[in-house]
Amino acid sequence: MPAVIAAFLCPLFHAVSNIIDAHLSNNVFRKLPTLIFYNCLTNFFAAPMVLVFGLPQWYGWEIMPLLALVGMIDVFYQIPYYEALRRGDTSVVVAWFSLGYVLVPVLAYLMVDEKLSFVQYAGFGIIIAASVVLNIENPRKIKINKAFYLMLLSSLLLSLQAVLYKYALEKIDWISAVFYSALFSTLTVFGFLMPRIVRLNIKANFPRYKTKFYVFGLNEFVNQVGTVASIFAMSLLPVVAVESINSTQPLFVLGIGAALYALFGNRFKEDVSTVHLLRKSICFVFITAGVFMVL
């Protein structure tokens, strides 16, 4: 029972993090480089928490390019992600993270000729079909929201990062992997300071960052709690079960978003009209089923 509770805590806390992301993207910072810079800066401040579990080890320069790529992806996937949060409802954008579950087996097929089963192909089709339905605003004129393509790019980057992370963890311990990838993420984001116009905007918004630091800190805290809960659940439950539970995250975003809408209005980018709630809920259930089939 504790493992099951932990497995559901992961999508719950990550849903809260997604809603905070939407708030930061739509209401706090107008320029994405500024938002990403301060977000990564907060992540770096939180990185030393991993030292509670042990100290990072030095494994030589050979592994560093791989960890550098992991760190760079951790920065650049945020660009299409935050832009998507500005173009679509938060719960729908989060649902499109499920595209990553599709991309991993597809990449495996293309790169190492790993065959997919009929059930996996069916799951792939269900996820894509449900994602397309989420885009339909006018049944007479089907038009794909640009947020879908942005999340497709973001999911592709995260899928590549997951494969690289898995490869790195076969050679080094997880503490070192987390520490060095966070270090490279910070070095990458400091590159944002090179263009003068971006540097000036980051400097001009530093007082606002200090004022909103508690929001960034809360976001990092709930995100880390969700990640730890997922790791704990994976130690006791099958990975397929945990990942399937994780795919319910859009439902948590929708539920929390509806509650926040009732309290604060549409400050968190979520359409909670009856028709949209029903359509989203049905599509999210199908996406969850599709993820379970692909895994």
Task: Write out the residue ranges for each language-model feature.
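Membrane-interface interhelical linkers
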Residues: 1-88, 136-152, 183-236, 259-285, ...
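Helix-coil boundary and interhelical linker segments in multi-pass alpha-helical membrane proteins
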Residues: 1-4, 52-62, 107-119, 166-176, ...
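Hydrophobic core positions of alpha-helical segments in small-molecule transporters
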Residues: 9, 37-38, 96-99, 119-122, ...
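Membrane-embedded alpha-helical core segments of multi-pass
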Residues: 13, 17, 73-80, 100-107, ...
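Structural motif at transmembrane-helix junctions in multi-pass transporters
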Residues: 27-34, 80-96, 115, 170-177, ...
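Residue-level recognition of pore/gate-forming positions within transmembrane alpha-helices
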Residues: 40-44, 98-102, 124-127, 131, ...
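C-terminal transmembrane-helix exit sites in multi-pass transporters
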Residues: 81, 100-122, 132, 236, ...
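Selected transmembrane alpha-helices and immediately adjacent juxtamembrane segments
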Residues: 146-176
